[in-house]
Amino acid sequence: MSNSNIHTTAVIAEGAKLGKNVKIGPYCIIGPEVVLHDNVELKSHVVIEGITEIGENTVIYPFASIGQPPQILKYANERSSTIIGSNNTIREYVTVQAGSQRGGMMTRVGNNNLFMVGVHIGHDCKIGNNVVFANYVSLAGHIGVGDYTIIGGLSAVHQYARIGEYSMIGGLSPVGADVIPFGLVSSKRAVLEGLNLIGMNRKGFDKVKSLSALKAIEEIFSGEGNFAERIKQVAEKYNNNSIVIQIIDFLNQDSNRAFCRFEK
């Protein structure tokens, strides 16, 4: 453990192997069969257990848990492992779990990856290099992910699925099948279905004006002519309805995004 910077509150079991310039922050827990290669940094409250190896220059943020047993009923305490490569960034609350007898006894992560807050990598997954998993991406067991893949936040991937190289999965996508290399996958996005009439009534908005505003947005989003013309026409037609005027003002503001598509 020479040349390592270890906080006095860290708990490092006898047998753990630390490379040069390893930094271990407050309240980290390192098991006896853990190997941390050169320049690994654990910020604080990081737990690394099991037969686990972390490659050089990897940085792990608070409350991440690496190398714990897989979440499967048939796990029989087999001596499976977790291998993580070099130059990875593993953010807060990420979990990477060990392999199992049914999956080759190893969970493996490559190099130069970014796992954002709350990512879960299940048992026996094989993750390539240069991938980005956004917040709360969840991978079940036995999943293969190719190099340069990007998975959007809150997406979940079914066990045994294969995600090909250079593919991109949009946020909030449930993926239950293989994704081809270079594929672009996304789930149905949120749509505008009307107005929040119940909430508006609870807040004391006039019921007649609320129903009139509902008709107005139907004319804006599904009427004849182009969008700008429809906005202008509706603004003139409902100029005495404060709810409609508030919606029109919002529509006329500059935005970096499109509007939710209207589906009646």
Swiss-Prot record:
Keywords: Acyltransferase, Cytoplasm, Lipid A biosynthesis, Lipid biosynthesis, Lipid metabolism, Repeat, Transferase. Signal peptide: none annotated. InterPro entries: Acetyltransf_C (IPR029098), Acetyltransf_C_sf (IPR037157), Hexapep (IPR001451), Hexapep_transf_CS (IPR018357), Lipid_A_LpxA (IPR010137), Trimer_LpxA-like_sf (IPR011004). Pathway: Glycolipid biosynthesis; lipid IV(A) biosynthesis; lipid IV(A) from (3R)-3-hydroxytetradecanoyl-[acyl-carrier-protein] and UDP-N-acetyl-alpha-D-glucosamine: step 1/6. GO terms for biological process: lipid A biosynthetic process. Its EC number is 2.3.1.129. One of its GO terms (molecular function) is acyl-[acyl-carrier-protein]-UDP-N-acetylglucosamine O-acyltransferase activity. Pfam families: Acetyltransf_11 (PF13720), Hexapep (PF00132). Coiled coil: none annotated. It catalyses: a (3R)-hydroxyacyl-[ACP] + UDP-N-acetyl-alpha-D-glucosamine = a UDP-3-O-[(3R)-3-hydroxyacyl]-N-acetyl-alpha-D-glucosamine + holo-[ACP]. It is found in: Cytoplasm. GO terms for cellular component: cytoplasm; membrane. Involved in the biosynthesis of lipid A, a phosphorylated glycolipid that anchors the lipopolysaccharide to the outer membrane of the cell. Belongs to the transferase hexapeptide repeat family. LpxA subfamily. Homotrimer. This is Acyl-[acyl-carrier-protein]--UDP-N-acetylglucosamine O-acyltransferase. It comes from Rickettsia conorii (strain ATCC VR-613 / Malish 7).
